[in-house]
Amino acid sequence: MSGEEEATVREPLDLIRLSLDERIYVKLRSDRELRGKLHAFDQHLNMILGDVEETITTVEIDDETYEEIVRTTKRTIEFLFVRGDGVILVSPPLRTAA
């Protein structure tokens, strides 16, 4: 199989397949975002990510002023299994034309 045939995108999961062993961005339910290296995935978007940076955003309302208070929490996780039913969006790395 030639390199061109391997890089062909015929269905959405092909784009994710091309991102194996590269850093991707994953947006999850509950205002969680992940950036990490994609090691494996399946048709349900279950994923195994390595060297993950998780960002959790919470919005609270101040009881006195009724202003929104936005808090962002970050943590680093060495290895993470992501269940596919919580995935909203997967973004492959940006590729530039050579």
Swiss-Prot record:
Recorded GO MF terms: RNA binding
Gene3D superfamilies in the cross-refs: 2.30.30.100
Q: Which residues form the Sm domain?
A: 11-96
**GO BP term (any one):** deadenylation-dependent decapping of nuclear-transcribed mRNA
Say if the entry is tagged with keyword Nucleus. Answer: yes
InterPro entries given in the database record: Lsm3, LSM_dom_sf, Sm, Sm-like_LSM3, Sm_dom_euk/arc
Q: Does the keyword Acetylation apply?
A: yes
List where in the cell it is found.
Answer: Cytoplasm; Nucleus
Provide the disulphide bond pattern.
Answer: none
Tissue note = Expressed in roots, leaves, stems, flowers and siliques.
Q: Which Pfam families match?
A: LSM
Cross-referenced SUPFAM superfamilies, in alphabetical order? Sm-like ribonucleoproteins
- What's any one GO cellular component for it? P-body
What the record says about family reads: Belongs to the snRNP Sm proteins family.
Q: Per its UniProt record, what PANTHER family does this chain match?
A: U6 SNRNA-ASSOCIATED SM-LIKE PROTEIN LSM3
Q: What does this protein do?
A: Component of LSM protein complexes, which are involved in RNA processing. Component of the cytoplasmic LSM1-LSM7 complex which is involved in mRNA degradation by promoting decapping and leading to accurate 5'-3' mRNA decay. The cytoplasmic LSM1-LSM7 complex regulates developmental gene expression by the decapping of specific development-related transcripts. Component of the nuclear LSM2-LSM8 complex which is involved splicing nuclear mRNAs.
Protein known as: Sm-like protein LSM3B
Q: Which organism is it from?
A: Arabidopsis thaliana (Mouse-ear cress)
